A protein has these predicted regions:
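Auxiliary Fe-S-binding modules of radical SAM enzymes
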Residues: 23, 48-52, 56-193
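Hydrophobic alpha-helical scaffolding
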Residues: 5-12, 37, 41, 88, ...
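Core AdoMet radical
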Residues: 1-24, 28-31, 37
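Active-site glycine- and acidic-residue-rich loops that bind
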Residues: 10, 35-51, 117-118
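Conserved short-loop catalytic and cofactor-binding motifs
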Residues: 3-6, 32-35, 86, 115, ...
Length: 193
């Protein structure tokens, strides 16, 4: 799958080996999975199995993969759609199932992130009940998903409200998942891609 959708990039084994090396050097990484294009269900779980294996090999002192973020293929205007006719038919229910299965299948990766950017508020809220412990962040700059037409927009305040509506207390964090206090004035910051 990677050879088809990521031409010109390293192959899966090379990427996994880079992650292993990073973990041995105590460099924290994250892992993603874009799905809903040309892959099969079996290939999705092969992806998860490889991540679980790499995480199990990390040194005891290292965090390894600090988070796993599954996100749905955003097909608008992509070469993959034009040439391969790949179309994202992933439903919200299917995305929630992927979050739940990721939580079960990846017990050695502490944080599972719901991709509000690709699935929107309502689905991301359900994901918090299905095993996601991270809503994701407000990105200062995001070019990949937004270029493919992801329609979802939030302010810091609206993210906090959405998390509270789902029954959880929002917590600002660093990239290393350390808690931070919410700075003054950030509540109204509008992120528009």
């Amino acid at each position: 799958v990677r050879a088809i959708i990521s031409t010109g990039k390293c192959n899966s084994q090379e990427w996994l080996d880079v992650m292993r090396t990073a973990h041995r050097l105590d460099i924290t990484t994250s892992a993603t999975m874009m799905f809903g294009h040309i892959e099969t269900i079996e290939e999705r779980f092969e992806h998860l199995a490889r991540l679980r294996q790499v995480q199990s090999e990390k040194p005891a002192h290292a965090k390894g993969f600090i988070a796993f973020i599954p996100w749905t293929f955003q097909d608008a205007g992509t070469t993959l759609r034009k040439i391969r006719r790949a179309k994202n038919d992933t439903t919200g229910e299917e995305y929630v199932r992927m979050i739940a299965l990721s939580r079960l299948f990846l017990p050695n990766i502490e944080n599972i992130q719901a991709s509000w950017l690709t699935v929107g508020k309502a689905v991301a809220q359900v994901c918090l009940e299905a095993g996601a412990n991270d809503w994701g962040s407000i990105m200062i700059e995001e070019n990949v998903v937004s270029a493919a037409g992801a329609p979802h927009r939030f302010t810091s305040r609206s993210i906090q409200e959405a998390i509270r509506e789902a029954g959880y207390e929002p917590q600002l964090r660093t990239q290393q998942y350390e808690d931070r206090a919410l700075p003054e004035g950030i509540e109204e910051q509008v992120i528009n891609y």
